[in-house]
């Protein structure tokens, strides 16, 4: 059976810590979408690990880690991540169906961002998915056969010839890309496998599989705040499509949310706080992107968005992250509805334009940091937790009270 960990906000919810905390109980940890535009930060024994492509189970020696078919892979960045770990043989597997991000994709991404102003990371994620959908992409499995790779690259060179100048690819792009693959392909090829068959077999054997998403539900290409979204499907349903596991294999869906809200880049954010309180949340919560180091926009918990995300994913339980960031705040707001042109909205709309948050205010608390038992939390904290559970209709089973792995309350 497989369990899914999915972010139910705009990403950066703390999925990495949760996966790291529970990965020891699983045989496989699988990253199922996105690329190196995402980032997980894990603190283990006082050491901070920043992961962008690697599944969060790499810190457990007995855990097998898979990068599945819907992930887009920068071979250079993956090689750099691999070099930071030891003994990954037979512990890391990259799907032969996953698509390869080329330097061209990053150049195209940066070029398009100038006019679209979406707030992308300019890592080439979107353009790589574009080529995938156009059936012209290069897959990881192509790296295993020099002849096939050469054919794919020649087709790529022909296709991009009219755009070389616009995307500033340089006169030696073809030669440089050939050298790029000669450098990195030998390092990555030993990890390329048919991971779909591996996971189907593992599920049939009854092995435990944890499926790890990147970004968050509200960034889903179809169901998020379009066009300010990522280029992949980020909900739990996409875990099946990417891995080859059928829906019957899914057991628990664990939705991850912060005790407040954040967003990176442009796009609507009804509960954003642009006062000094937003700055306080950013500073105390260290809200700066793992990948881009960009400051995250911060605000209050949005229950309209949270209920929507829980429904989309079929969440069976929640993990509440960064509760300690709210310590010491006298009055804590929660968005319970929107108002738009005089109308009260309690259902998340497809367009958030003109939506103004309607807040309910709670009394704050002094300290929750480092607490590991529910009974040790102050009454006002417990009231806040109960209210979230009641409004969303899903039980909170895990609460994080600091970045440390051990500072976690299990319910």
Curated annotation (Swiss-Prot):
Gene3D superfamilies: Adenylosuccinate Synthetase, subunit A, domain 1, Adenylosuccinate Synthetase, subunit A, domain 2, Adenylosuccinate Synthetase, subunit A, domain 3. Its EC number is 6.3.4.4. One of its GO terms (molecular function) is GTP binding. Its main location: cytoplasm. One of its GO terms (biological process) is IMP metabolic process. CDD domains: AdSS (cd03108). It catalyses: IMP + L-aspartate + GTP = N(6)-(1,2-dicarboxyethyl)-AMP + GDP + phosphate + 2 H(+). It is found in: Cytoplasm. Binds 1 Mg(2+) ion per subunit. Its cofactor is Mg(2+). Belongs to the adenylosuccinate synthetase family. Homodimer. This is Adenylosuccinate synthetase. It comes from Helicobacter pylori (strain ATCC 700392 / 26695). The gene is purA.
């Amino acid at each position: 059976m497989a369990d899914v960990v999915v972010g139910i906000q705009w990403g950066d919810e703390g999925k990495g810590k949760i996966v790291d905390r529970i990965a020891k109980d699983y045989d496989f940890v699988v990253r199922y979408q996105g690329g190196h535009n995402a980032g997980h930060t894990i603190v283990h024994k006082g050491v901070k690990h920043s992961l962008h492509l690697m599944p969060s189970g790499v810190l457990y020696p007995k855990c097998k880690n898979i990068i599945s078919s819907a992930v887009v892979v920068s071979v250079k960045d993956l090689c750099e991540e691999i070099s930071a770990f030891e003994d990954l043989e037979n512990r890391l597997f990259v799907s032969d169906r996953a698509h390869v991000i080329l330097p061209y994709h990053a150049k195209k991404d940066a070029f398009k961002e100038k006019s679209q102003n979406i707030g992308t990371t300019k890592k080439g994620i979107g353009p790589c998915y574009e080529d995938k959908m156009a059936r012209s992409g290069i897959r990881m499995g192509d790296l295993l056969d020099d002849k096939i790779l050469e054919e794919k690259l020649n087709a790529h060179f022909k296709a991009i010839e009219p755009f070389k100048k616009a995307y500033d690819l340089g006169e030696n792009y073809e030669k440089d890309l050939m050298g790029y693959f000669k450098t990195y392909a030998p390092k990555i090829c030993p990890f390329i496998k048919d991971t779909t068959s591996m996971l189907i077999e593992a599920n049939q054997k009854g092995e435990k599989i944890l499926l790890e998403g990147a970004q968050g539900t509200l960034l889903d290409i179809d169901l998020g705040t379009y066009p300010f979204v990522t280029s992949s499907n980020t909900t739990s349903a996409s875990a099946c499509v990417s891995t080859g596991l059928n829906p019957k294999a899914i057991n628990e869906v664990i939705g991850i949310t912060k005790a407040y809200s954040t967003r990176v880049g442009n796009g609507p954010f009804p509960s954003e706080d642009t006062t000094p309180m937003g700055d306080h949340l950013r500073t105390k919560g260290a809200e700066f992107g793992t990948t881009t180091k960009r400051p995250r926009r911060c605000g209050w918990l949005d229950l309209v968005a949270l209920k929507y995300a829980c429904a989309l994913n079929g969440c069976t339980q929640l993990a509440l992250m960064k509760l300690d960031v709210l310590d010491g705040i006298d009055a804590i707001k929660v968005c319970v509805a929107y108002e738009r042109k005089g109308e009260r909205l309690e259902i998340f709309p497809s367009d958030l334009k003109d939506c103004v948050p309607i807040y309910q205010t709670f009394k704050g608390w002094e300290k929750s940091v480092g607490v590991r038992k529910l009974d040790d939390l102050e009454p006002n904290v417990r009231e806040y937790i109960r209210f979230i559970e009641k409004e969303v209709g899903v039980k909170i089973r895990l609460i994080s009270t600091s970045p440390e792995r051990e500072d976690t309350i299990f319910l």
